């Protein structure tokens, strides 16, 4: 990234002698912005547009066609004074080339969070600005390295191969990045990848190496705090990924495990929620013990997390206030969450809001 700090004093004296450049609209914006910033530094304020468009010698732009850039119809005409830092940060997080990064930032009006969302939603949006760098044969060869006969899954990566993959990536099994990896690859089964899932996932990230894969997954993880939509998408994916194929709901222990993976260190409300669920399980077991006897009662799992509860719990824990003062009792919440709120207000001294002053949930981040 040192090239981004290179000398900004371009050869103004030779400007009229150089042949005219063919610039993309986004490249034109940045060159104009840099020229205007330089002009401000030396006290020049009355330069015309033709005088202020100066070559950028320290950004290694690949030549890009106007056809490729035509995919963006909202390229920004104004870039901030700290645009170099924004561009550098975007390149570092996404590992995208500078021309591609520039186009995404311009399309997002230099809002880096929005630009990253655009990039991960469609990394090939400006693919014509830079050639694809993924080697399919390398990806298949990489997949083959992690197929382990001990798993007995044929041409699939199984638990043994997955363990080696995580070691090479430097991830612990309970690391959220492991779940993000499964989400990006659209994996259907825990601890397994099919060849199609692996190759499609690598292609979507535009990588064909372990190092490249780690950089992209790390960047996605870092961006989760700023992009709650992606965090919710990850959470919704986890329900199907975590439950058994034969079940319609998620086992309580599995649900708690994945909540810890997604949300990290437990905040008080999360801890109280989990304690409440364990309490529900104990009460259910006591009833089953009376009806079926101790031996048979242990064979029955009495508390399950339904899809509705799982999905809406994200809204509850992320978007709601920690004191539950904005909880709408008339809202379409699952019964289990209603019961938890009643428990908090009756047994844990949570405030009981006035109904006439109850407000809709305000946006706030759990993280």
From Swiss-Prot:
Subcellular location: Nucleus
Basic and acidic residues bias: start-end ranges: 1-19
Region (Disordered): 1-24
Pfam families, A to Z: Cullin_binding (PF03556), UBA_4 (PF14555)
InterPro entries according to UniProt: DCN-prot, DCN1-like_PONY, PONY_dom, UBA-like_sf
Primary location group: nucleus
Gene Ontology molecular function, alphabetical: cullin family protein binding; ubiquitin binding; ubiquitin conjugating enzyme binding; ubiquitin-like protein binding
Stretches assigned to the UBA-like domain: 83-120
Biological role stated in the UniProt entry: Required for neddylation of cullin components of SCF-type E3 ubiquitin ligase complexes. Neddylation of cullins play an essential role in the regulation of SCF-type complexes activity. Does not act by preventing deneddylation, but rather facilitates neddylation, possibly by acting with rbx-1 to recruit the Nedd8-charged E2 enzyme to the cullin component of SCF-type complexes.
Quaternary organization: Interacts with the cullin cul-3. Interacts with ubiquitin via its UBA-like domain. Interacts with ned-8/nedd8.
Full protein name: Defective in cullin neddylation protein 1
Organism: Caenorhabditis briggsae
């Amino acid at each position: 990234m040192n090239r981004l700090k290179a000398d900004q004093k371009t050869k103004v004296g030779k400007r009229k002698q150089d042949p005219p450049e063919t610039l993309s609209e986004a490249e034109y914006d940045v060159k104009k912005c840099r020229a205007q910033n330089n002009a401000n530094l030396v006290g020049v304020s009355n330069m015309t547009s033709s005088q202020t468009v100066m070559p950028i010698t320290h950004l290694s732009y690949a030549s890009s066609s106007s056809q490729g850039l035509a995919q963006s119809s909202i390229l920004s005409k104004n870039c901030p004074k700290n645009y170099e830092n924004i561009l550098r940060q975007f390149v570092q997080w996404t590992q995208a080339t500078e021309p591609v990064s520039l186009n995404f930032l311009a399309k997002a009006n230099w809002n880096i969070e929005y630009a990253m969302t655009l990039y991960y939603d469609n990394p090939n949006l400006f693919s014509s600005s830079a050639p694809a760098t993924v080697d399919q044969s390398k990806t298949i060869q990489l997949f083959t390295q992690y197929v382990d006969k001990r798993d007995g899954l044929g041409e699939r990566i199984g638990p043994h191969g997955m363990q080696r993959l995580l070691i090479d990536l430097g991830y612990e099994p309970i690391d959220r990045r492991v779940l993000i990896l499964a989400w990006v690859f659209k994996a259907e089964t825990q601890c397994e990848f099919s060849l199609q899932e692996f190759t499609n996932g690598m292609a979507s990230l535009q990588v064909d190496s372990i190092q490249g894969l780690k950089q992209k997954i790390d960047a996605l993880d870092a961006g989760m705090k700023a992009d709650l939509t992606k965090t919710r998408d990850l959470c919704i994916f986890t329900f199907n990924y975590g439950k058994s194929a034969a079940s319609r709901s998620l086992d309580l222990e599995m649900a708690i495990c994945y909540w810890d993976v997604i949300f990290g260190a437990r905040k008080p409300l999360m801890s109280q929620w989990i304690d409440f669920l364990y309490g529900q399980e104990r009460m259910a077991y006591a009833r089953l013990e009376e009806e079926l006897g101790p031996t048979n009662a242990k064979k029955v799992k009495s508390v399950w997390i339904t899809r509705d509860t799982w999905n809406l719990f994200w809204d509850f824990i992320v978007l709601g206030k920690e004191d539950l003062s904005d909880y709408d009792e008339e809202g379409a919440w699952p019964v289990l969450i209603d019961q938890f709120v009643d428990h908090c207000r009756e047994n844990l001294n949570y405030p009981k809001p006035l109904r006439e002053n109850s407000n809709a949930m305000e946006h706030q981040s759990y993280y």
